[in-house]
Amino acid sequence: MALEILGVEGIPEVDAGADLAGLIAKAGTYRDGDILLVTSKVVSKAEGRLLHAADRDAAIDAETVRVVARRGPARIVENRNGFVMAAAGVDASNTAPGTVLLLPEDPDASARALRSRLQQLTGCRLAVVVTDTFGRPWRNGLTDVAIGAAGLSVLEDHRGRTDSHGNELVLTVTATADELAAAADLVKGKATGVPVAIVRGLGHLVTAEDGAGTRPLVRAAADDMFRLGTSEALRQAVTLRRTVRSFTTDPVDPAAVRRAVAAAVTAPAPHHTTPWRFVLLESAGTRVRLLDAMLGAWQRDLRELDGWDEARIARRTARGDVLRDAPYLVVPCLVMDGSHDYPDPRRAAAEREMFTVAAGAGVQNLLVALTGEGYGSAWVSSTMFCRDTVREVLDLPEGWDPMGAVAVGRPAEVPRERRREAEAFVEVR
């Protein structure tokens, strides 16, 4: 296979409203099967996507769907086309001083329009790829990628084929359009005034139809293992926690729970103590025995302490039970080992409260870590109302005080977003 990559020289400065296809057709000589790689900047200029530089930040805001990462003034964002890139593609290079360029509003539509017009003007069967320069995760340096395409299959799926050793290819899907964009940039460069390149010798990649454009190249945020920067992911991990009351029947990975417990025991605690214990109820039989005993204790309290009749007790205890429906339970316990003894009730109460706060911090860490593992959770206070019963059923030491129970499982539905503004909970003195 022979391959040529040719820069198309002689294209003049492009202004808004220019016939870009006409300028490209006039500047080069084309053949059937040629693939034209066109830098996005000349497309944007022809489409009038030019702003005053003073409007740059506002333009980035307008083009941004979500912020992926922020480092000082620099922003990596997802734009309306699904591209994850620096500054939403708003760029001050290769444009007049005091101006910035936006990406084409619909790069695939731009590629289709260019292809149609160029094929009319040249009489050749062509493909068009609109390119832009991106940074890359895991690696330094920039390279061009495809942001718009027409007449080209942008991906080549090798899955199911075999390599030269007979091994089946299971995951290999080649980003053909990106490979072409990067190769073409070798002759286009960044400051040479050559905005278009021809890749010749790959005519078999050119399709009769315009095709799906670059959409197949764009990984949905929900499928992206690296959808946030490190700092952003750490912040979001805390706020993503929700109380989940409905679970699937999928089993819970005990190793994931133990990783969450490892996070839980990093919580702060008084006097250099470790006041947390986590009882993991991995046996269905144990869960049922505990919940049945707790139900009996609850019914006794309603009957003997609250004076309820049997019908009212039955109605109250018949309501849905998130603990009984969960595939996994954790019973966090507080131990007061290392606490200080005080002779007066004020300081004794404060000492107990210090340890209780530490227990709560451990439970919160557990819940947040479970969210990071992909599990939903719900903290329920019920074991605190029948601690003796819980200790008896689970054979726990007398000094272990159950501090509720945590239901764990895969959420049956996506938890609803909850917005709470910090100012509603803040007083400044």
From Swiss-Prot:
Coenzyme F420-(gamma-Glu)n binds at residue 301. One of its GO terms (molecular function) is GTP binding. A divalent metal cation 2 binds at residue 133. It comes from Kitasatospora aureofaciens. This is Bifunctional F420 biosynthesis protein FbiB. Keywords: GTP-binding, Ligase, Magnesium, Manganese, Metal-binding, Multifunctional enzyme, Nucleotide-binding, Oxidoreductase, Potassium. Disulfide bonds: none annotated. Pathway: Cofactor biosynthesis; coenzyme F420 biosynthesis. InterPro entries: F420-0_g-glutamyl_ligase (IPR008225), F420-0_gamma-glut_ligase-dom (IPR002847), F420_FbiB_C (IPR019943), FbiB (IPR023661), Nitroreductase (IPR029479), Nitroreductase-like (IPR000415). Residues 1-229 are annotated as: Coenzyme F420:L-glutamate ligase. Its cofactor is Mg(2+); Mn(2+); K(+). It comes from the Bacteria. The keyword Magnesium applies. NCBIfam families: F420_cofE, F420_FbiB_CTERM, PRK13294.1. It catalyses: oxidized coenzyme F420-0 + GTP + L-glutamate = oxidized coenzyme F420-1 + GDP + phosphate + H(+); oxidized coenzyme F420-0 + FMN + H(+) = dehydro coenzyme F420-0 + FMNH2; oxidized coenzyme F420-1 + GTP + L-glutamate = oxidized coenzyme F420-2 + GDP + phosphate + H(+). Bifunctional enzyme that catalyzes the GTP-dependent successive addition of two or more gamma-linked L-glutamates to the L-lactyl phosphodiester of 7,8-didemethyl-8-hydroxy-5-deazariboflavin (F420-0) to form polyglutamated F420 derivatives, and the FMNH2-dependent reduction of dehydro-F420-0 to form F420-0. In the N-terminal section; belongs to the CofE family. Binds 2 divalent metal cations per subunit. The ions could be magnesium and/or manganese. Monovalent cation. The ion could be potassium. GTP binds at residues 11-14, 40, 45, 94. A divalent metal cation 1 binds at residues 91, 132.
